[in-house]
Amino acid sequence: MKASQFLFATLKETPSDADIASSQLMVRAGLIRKIASGLYIWLPMGLRVLQKVERIVREEMQNIGAQEVLMPMTQPAELWQLTGRFNDYGPELLRFKDRHDRDFVLGPTHEEVITNLAQGELRSYKQLPITFFQIQNKFRDEIRPRFGVMRAREFTMKDAYSFHVDQASLAKTYDEMYDAYTRIFTRLGLDFRAVQADTGSIGGFASHEFHVLADSGEDDIAFSDSSEYAANVELAESVSMAERQPATMARENIDTVNMPTCEAVAEHLNVPLATTVKTLIVQGHTPEGEPQLIAVVLRGDHTLNTIKAEKIEEANVPLMMATEEELKAAGLHKGYIGVELNMPVFVDRAAAALSDFVSGANEINKHTTGMNWERDAHITRIVDIRNVHEGDPSPDGKGTLQIKRGIEVGHIFQLGDKYSQAMNCTVSGEDGKPVTLMMGCYGIGVSRIIAAAIEQNNDENGIMWPSTPDISDSLAPFEVAIVPMKSKEDTVMETATALYEELKALGINVLLDDRNERPGVKFADLELIGIPHRIVVSDRNLAEDKYEYVNRRDSEKQLLSRDEVIAKVSGK
């Protein structure tokens, strides 16, 4: 492509409403333009990047036998009503009526539509397993769209859905999809982690997220420094680092006036925060379903993980703290609640390992020192209900946990029969009887990948696209830019054009920057856009049969022969 015939929409100034590096750089580099909150136009430069991601995703889906379809973005509401998600999904689901007063939604995802398709097209177990995928725009009416295309209202997504007669078949396809995702993100040159995750509103019983590591990420992920263990912090398992020691202290009530926090009490007593416990009272129910309060106990230096706590059978979902009225009725005072209670007491593993600890005294302005389990208080059940910390032992026994921020770019689920059961999606089994299909769903945020890659790869001059094992997989809109310097002779442009044609013939995406601009302007634009390889053709260097080569990542200038230049940019 010749730059003089291409839309160069670079900007010198940073947009005032762009809040993170990727958003700023995508606008400045001329990849996107905002037309409304959360809505963006992909300009020619950006569309080249988007199409590269789509190509790699499409190739890997086809490599595992997934078949491409294209479903409508507009979906009839009755399908969502069948699964109950029309009311449950929340305000992110854009609902509207057509001129005939029929209800429709703009699809944020396509489980209902694909299940409806399977219901109509799949008849026999002999057609299974089968996987469909599409690459298509989705719409979620985010209350506060932010971070550019990272959290836009309309975005490009690859969603795939698999259908099976049994769990074993689903698990096999799930593993194949996991491996395909790993290949996709590896080909894209991203530093990523696959982590165990919560199934959320999609539902199901097994799930992994794929996160690109970046400081601007919205999720905390925990992973071992010595093994493959990784999980979203919401699900990362905590293990106790010590066994409970025998009691050595007698219990004693002490005055802690106006000290309702563990931090204040620990400072007052001059003891480590980790030797205190805090008791939270939450709403729950008996095995018979009758309302009751339950207590959850954590070490003073730990925080409650609500997703884990919701897995306590006796806890209500969503997890709700007891109201002031409920605490008053139970004779309890917030900030001074102890562990001797007339209700079920669920104790986190780390808190259960304590001896001679400090707790509330169930009396306002008082705490108790020298508390010990069994001797002084009963544990209903030991549970894992805390958020893990950096440096905690890895649950697999290998190494310690690191915690970093991550940007979710992919999510895979084993859904089971949640949707097929609701929509009566069955096939004839081997015995001729109806079999309700098992499902998997697998999403990749295609447009989000681009922002995540930039968050992970940028400097003060602009974008630095990830280095990829194969140059053809580079996310850069052009892998190579050739810059002919102005000259009175035609030789410079002729040589630059000849090199341009030669590299194109090798299948390399090349930009010939023949714009009527100063060299400094051209170089700044190419660095901003992130072109990995820059080749400068000039009279002076041609006199020595050399070309100036600069790699975007190190900015080191090298004088190379034609063959050396071709070897550099082609990786051969």
Curated annotation (Swiss-Prot):
NCBIfam families, per the entry: PRK09194.1, proS_fam_II
GO BP: prolyl-tRNA aminoacylation
Lineage: Bacteria, Pseudomonadati, Pseudomonadota, Gammaproteobacteria, Moraxellales
The keyword Nucleotide-binding belongs to this UniProt entry's keyword annotation: yes
Any GO CC annotation of this UniProt entry: cytosol
Chief localisation class: cytoplasm
Keywords, sorted A to Z: Aminoacyl-tRNA synthetase, ATP-binding, Cytoplasm, Ligase, Nucleotide-binding, Protein biosynthesis
Enzyme class: ligase
Catalytic activity: tRNA(Pro) + L-proline + ATP = L-prolyl-tRNA(Pro) + AMP + diphosphate
UniProt subcellular location: Cytoplasm
Assembly description: Homodimer.
SUPFAM superfamilies associated with the record: Class II aaRS ABD-related (SSF52954), Class II aaRS and biotin synthetases (SSF55681), YbaK/ProRS associated domain (SSF55826)
Domain notes: Consists of three domains: the N-terminal catalytic domain, the editing domain and the C-terminal anticodon-binding domain.
Family: Belongs to the class-II aminoacyl-tRNA synthetase family. ProS type 1 subfamily.
Descriptive protein name: Proline--tRNA ligase
E.C. no: 6.1.1.15
Known function: Catalyzes the attachment of proline to tRNA(Pro) in a two-step reaction: proline is first activated by ATP to form Pro-AMP and then transferred to the acceptor end of tRNA(Pro). As ProRS can inadvertently accommodate and process non-cognate amino acids such as alanine and cysteine, to avoid such errors it has two additional distinct editing activities against alanine. One activity is designated as 'pretransfer' editing and involves the tRNA(Pro)-independent hydrolysis of activated Ala-AMP.
GO molecular-function terms, A-Z: aminoacyl-tRNA deacylase activity; ATP binding; proline-tRNA ligase activity
Superkingdom in the source lineage: Bacteria
InterPro entries reported for this sequence: aa-tRNA-synt_IIb, aa-tRNA-synth_II, aa-tRNA-synth_II/BPL/LPL, Anticodon-bd, Anticodon-bd_dom_sf, Pro-tRNA-ligase_IIa, Pro-tRNA-synth_IIa_bac-type, Pro-tRNA-Synthase_IIa_type1
Keyword Acetylation on entry: no
